[in-house]
Amino acid sequence: MIQNSFIFLEGIGAKREKEFWSNGISDWDRFIDCEKINKISKGRKLFYNRRLGEAKKALFGFDSSFFNILSHSQNWRLYDFFKEDAVFLDIETTGLDRFHDDITVFGIYDGLNSKTMIKGINMDYDLLKKELQKYKLIITFNGSSFDVPFINKRCPDLLPKIPNFDVKFLARYLGYQGGLKKIERDLGYQRPEIVNEFNGGDALSLWKMYKATGDEYYLNLLVEYNELDIVNLKKITDILVSKIKGQIFS
């Protein structure tokens, strides 16, 4: 989808982009090959050609950082190309204040395997930083508002400077309301009963119970809750990206 995108070009919005598609200018190569395009001056066309050439070089050089020029709401366009090099990420914390609260659980999932780091047990930010360098796209739910700013404040330079595809934006655009678990249910997914009704507040309570009692039962529930967030996020992402593409090209 990213190679069909022109919305990152200066002065090109969604309406103009759709006009390109309607006129057969469906990807970067077709745009560049056109000698002239209606309503675009010769000088502007040359500028756009250079910009698309830069985008193409970055894409096939797997330099996803180039596409930080996209707005958060448009990062879904990167998913098809970078999904094999994407990481689904979710954190649990002691509260919402990134200036004073801490990260208790850090979960990541590459689409095949999940990894969990826990405060006071196996949390190793050097190892985590090395692991995250492998990826080209970070995928979160509400991460642009919470997870990423929280991590950047508590652990500066931990995250690579790559785009964050916050699936919440895409879900809202497609008409899905509520949090991740509500959207899961709307799409037919059901979590195990013991964690089905958990929310962020319950995650904090589980951490507090674990710290107060030392009973790993509470910790295991918290880890399961976090892992389901990232594993199910991939399922939801696959569905929602397919839906938005179907809408655009229908």
What are these regions (language model features)?
Residues 100-101, 151-153, 238:
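Short amphipathic alpha-helical segments
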Residues 1-82:
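N-terminal accessory regions of nucleic-acid-interacting proteins
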Residues 105-108, 112-190:
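Conserved DEDDh/DEDDy metal-dependent 3′-5′ exonuclease domain
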Residues 90-92, 147, 166, 229:
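Acidic active-site catalytic centers that drive phospho-/nucleotidyl reactions
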Residues 27, 124, 146-147, 229-232:
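Short phosphate-engaging motifs
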Residues 24, 155, 240:
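Active-site catalytic pocket residues across diverse enzymes, especially alpha/beta-hydrolases
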Residues 67-137:
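Conserved RNase H-like, two-metal-ion catalytic cores of nucleic-acid enzymes
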Residues 188-250:
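Acidic, Mg2+-coordinating catalytic module of metal-dependent nucleases/exonucleases
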